[in-house]
């Protein structure tokens, strides 16, 4: 089981949804420091987070996932402030299929840049002590989604990156493990205005099915994701659907 005592946690994402619920629950652990990284600060939510556990130092760092220089500068400041990073959770996610650049940038390339910029503060051969990176994907990273093809492409990319970084050789050298979370349909801001954010107009059947389907609450999904993290399975992928946790066992189609 993962020991949260004295850990420095970095969360990249908004002040809502599953990722934010994870932060609120992690504040109840005996962590040392919580760093929130997003393009805009929500002062009231930061105060609410701090109030959960006054003994944890909570800080905010402005960062634009669409800008590599912004990511570089912000992550360096956060790493220097913390000294080292133990846990990094990439929880940002947008569903804007008509805007390909933003969908890929916020969901995938920004996540890759932020992870790689954080690695010097996690890698035990550099300034880190080892740790854990958790990347938020989706069940649409495992299956196709004809209504949201660009979003699905980004989610598939997250899993490819996470599994590759979760290689045993990388872990043995860096001490950093990687995991991916694939939530099912969840009550969140992302689920609003689905019809305005489809890839193209031939998507009515899928949108209607999603709109009428049952959804899990962000807090129950967050609880299960933290449980998965505590199992410390490097390179693993987890479906979190309707408050239930299930590990994904990938099929190998090719081997060198």
Curated annotation (Swiss-Prot):
NAD(+) binds at residues 10-34. SUPFAM superfamilies: NAD(P)-binding Rossmann-fold domains (SSF51735). Substrate binds at residue 138. GO terms for cellular component: cytoplasm. InterPro entries: ADH_Ceratitis-type, NAD(P)-bd_dom_sf, SDR_fam. The active site is at 151 (proton acceptor). It comes from the Eukaryota. Keywords: Oxidoreductase. Belongs to the short-chain dehydrogenases/reductases (SDR) family. This is Fat body protein 2. It comes from Drosophila simulans (Fruit fly).
